[in-house]
Amino acid sequence: MNDKGLLFIDEASGLSVDDIKDLSSTRSSGAVTMNKIIKGEARARTRLVWLSNPRSGRNVAEFYWKGFGAFQEYIPVVEDQARYDLVLTAAREDLDVLDGIDSTSMPQTAMWRALFSAAWNLTADQIKFSSDFKATMREVAHKLNDDYGGGPLVVGVAVHEKLLRLSCAMAVLCGDVYDGNLQVTSKHLDWAQQWLRYTLEKPSLSYGAYIREKRRAEQKKQENINWIKAQLELHPALKSLLTASSFKGYQITEILGIDRADASKLLSELLGRGLVKTGRSSSYIPDKLLLDVARQEEVNLNV
């Protein structure tokens, strides 16, 4: 089953979500199971390269989060998204003009084949790391997680694995093989993290922008939770409104026992924070976050 081989999957947009789940299982376990006339299992420790257009046929630029949005559409399960070492986009806006490409001559592939073959046949004990590599890796991995953690492409406990592979690739490209051993240094690690950052910040992928917006939304959510708790402590009767399916504006005055000016100010704050929305017949509908916090506070009081 192509054990320890390289596998390219082209036109992968034709695969169903279930097909991708099966391949992800193979990727994590290193084994493939066949259920036909008889059941069989074989080792399938492959390095996978996926090539695909967006599943829906839309251009990358049409997705709100550009290439990452297309990736989410193609691989909807977050756990499966995290299995990919690299997610690269090839969009029209990435390269308008081929600069420095001579279309009249064939590329010299023999040198690259030899380099690829040499790298592929390296064993684990032939890869040596400099004495400062481990400490530098810890710092670089922490910084990457600080900048891009919280999403599937940079996971704090596993990002060092991506950096290790990329660092080895950088060492191979530099030809840093001495006495039959690949010498990987902090210099290669620095280039690896720079390149990984470049791919994440690439406008056509938009992962960096996605993470920053995700963190902003999470911070706003926490601020809203703290504000709701403070209001419930100040006005315990507010819980009866927040746990209702809807309420009228005048009920704030009646239930909380506050004047119309204070009620209007409270309602305006709820609307401004996106915690209620307008409904039919001048009613207001609480956001799910309001319901969750109010119910949790009730549970805490009853404990």
Give, region by region, the residue ranges found by the protein language model:
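Activation segment
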Residues: 16-17, 58-59, 256, 294
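Terminal-proximal interaction/regulatory segments of ATP-powered molecular machines
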Residues: 158, 174-185, 203-303
